[in-house]
């Protein structure tokens, strides 16, 4: 089945199968692939493992088989650390490709996926032989989708995820220029990659082909591409985001369980993982990743999500090979995006979990975000996975602080008996355990 996000390059189409991902190549694209396969990059672990299938079906000149990635994610879900790593990965591959007489024609972060902390470049069709006199055509794309979002976070402490979700083309040079102050002009890279870029784009917007011809006539050299890529790499490598944590960023310090309850909660999760033996776990509202790490230590691959960019970034820096940390607000989750709403999929369409963890989550969504309990449990049931869910009683201090900010009576249905009735209508309850003198309850349930 053709991937509905693979249509922009007619000579290079991707098809998904249960066991692998396949790529059909035109005759021209097949020649470029074989140039890559004959280079020193052929078995590079940074590039998705690929082999050519013996017999390509019509109309393709060649058919490639790619190793599957555990879970597909998108740049508008990544924390700063992952986007920075993806940018550095692409620049390193660009430089290494140039050494081999190749170049990357694209520079979109969507060409990078994650196997835990390890970045994997998945678009082998982006490699082509370098032609003398040509510039790096991916430069603008790199700026809009990788450099500018990183600058926005590092220089202005503005989250880039909504920008990338709002436009699959990223942030235009003129848009970023208008967000920068006079003082920002003097930052490293600002003049060349933002202000000059915006000016030149305005001047040559309708003359792309003419500019390419002029560069070739002027004797544009590969060394200039290399020099620009190296400078970009130095700029990206030096960027750091020091954004302040949102309200729940220090959850473990602010709302810590006593030692006994913490051990019992960890034991409950550990037991659930052993009972279910999941391959894929979703840890919703993962915070510092305590329970993600428990599941990963028992062989599961964990997609750990939280709305707090700060804690997700902190988890990404730990570089756990079995945990993919994503910035996801479950009350405003990433929708299907792009052409016909099919280029980028929502979370559940990318592969549902075998086990879902929803710990210290329900009260936030029900009280803070005003999500109706029946609908929240309907959504969890729709994942069709085993579920570990925690209910925090209205009498608990955690819930009391949230309820204090709400109109009296607004959440009258937020009650343990109501929750258990709704839960029992959708799931079979396998095990429960009370913590904090009954003010917090853990449930292991399976879909009916």
Model-derived features: positions:
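Catalytic activation segment of kinase domains across protein kinase-like and atypical kinase folds
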Residues: 103, 108-154
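A conserved beta-strand element that flanks and buttresses the S-adenosyl-L-methionine
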Residues: 357
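S-adenosyl-L-methionine
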Residues: 316-350
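Conserved beta-strand signature within the Rossmann-like core of class I S-adenosyl-L-methionine
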Residues: 379-394
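Conserved SAM-binding motif I beta-strand of class I
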Residues: 301-306
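A short, conserved alpha-helix within the catalytic core of class I
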Residues: 364-380
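Conserved SAM-binding loop of SAM-dependent methyltransferases across substrates and taxa
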Residues: 288-300
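Conserved class I S-adenosyl-L-methionine
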Residues: 277-287
């Amino acid at each position: 089945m053709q991937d509905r996000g693979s249509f922009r390059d007619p000579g290079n189409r991707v098809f998904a199968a249960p066991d692998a991902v396949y790529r059909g190549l035109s005759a021209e694209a097949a020649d470029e692939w074989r140039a890559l396969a004959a280079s020193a990059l052929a078995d590079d672990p940074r590039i998705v493992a690929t082999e050519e299938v013996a017999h390509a079906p019509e109309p393709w000149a060649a058919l490639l088989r790619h190793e599957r990635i555990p879970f597909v994610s998108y740049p508008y879900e990544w924390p700063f650390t992952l986007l920075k790593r993806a940018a550095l990965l692409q620049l390193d591959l660009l430089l290494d490709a140039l050494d081999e007489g190749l170049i990357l024609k694209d520079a979109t972060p969507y060409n990078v996926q994650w196997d835990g902390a390890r970045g994997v470049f998945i678009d082998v069709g982006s490699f082509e032989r370098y032609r003398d006199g040509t510039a790096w055509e991916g430069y603008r794309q790199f700026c809009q989708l990788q450099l500018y979002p990183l600058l926005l976070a590092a220089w202005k402490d503005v989250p880039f995820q909504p920008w990338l979700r709002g436009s699959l083309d990223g942030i235009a040079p003129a848009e970023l220029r208008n967000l920068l102050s006079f003082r920002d002009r003097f930052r490293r890279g600002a003049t060349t990659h933002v202000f000059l870029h915006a000016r030149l784009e305005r001047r040559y917007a309708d003359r792309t082909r003419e500019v390419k011809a002029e560069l070739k006539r002027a004797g544009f050299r590969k060394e200039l591409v290399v020099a620009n890529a190296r400078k970009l790499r130095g700029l990206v490598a030096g960027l750091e985001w020091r954004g302040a944590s949102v309200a729940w960023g220090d959850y473990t310090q602010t709302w810590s369980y006593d030692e006994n309850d913490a051990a019992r909660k960890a034991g409950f999760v550990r037991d659930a993982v052993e009972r279910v033996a999941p391959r894929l776990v979703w840890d919703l509202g993962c915070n510092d990743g305590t329970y993600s790490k428990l599941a990963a230590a028992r062989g599961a691959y964990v997609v750990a999500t939280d709305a707090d960019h700060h804690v997700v970034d902190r988890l990404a820096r730990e570089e756990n090979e079995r945990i993919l940390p994503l910035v996801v607000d479950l009350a405003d989750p990433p929708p299907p995006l792009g052409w016909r709403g099919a280029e980028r999929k929502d979370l559940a369409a990318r592969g549902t979990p075998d086990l879902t963890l929803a710990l210290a989550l329900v009260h936030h969504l029900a009280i803070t975000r005003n999500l109706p309990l029946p609908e929240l449990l309907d959504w969890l049931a729709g994942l069709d996975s085993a579920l570990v869910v925690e209910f925090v009683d209205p009498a608990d201090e955690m819930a009391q602080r949230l309820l204090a900010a709400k109109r009296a009576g607004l959440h009258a249905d937020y009650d343990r008996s109501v929750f258990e009735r709704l839960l029992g209508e959708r799931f079979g309850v396998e095990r429960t355990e009370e913590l904090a003198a009954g003010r917090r309850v853990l449930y292991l349930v399976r879909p009916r």
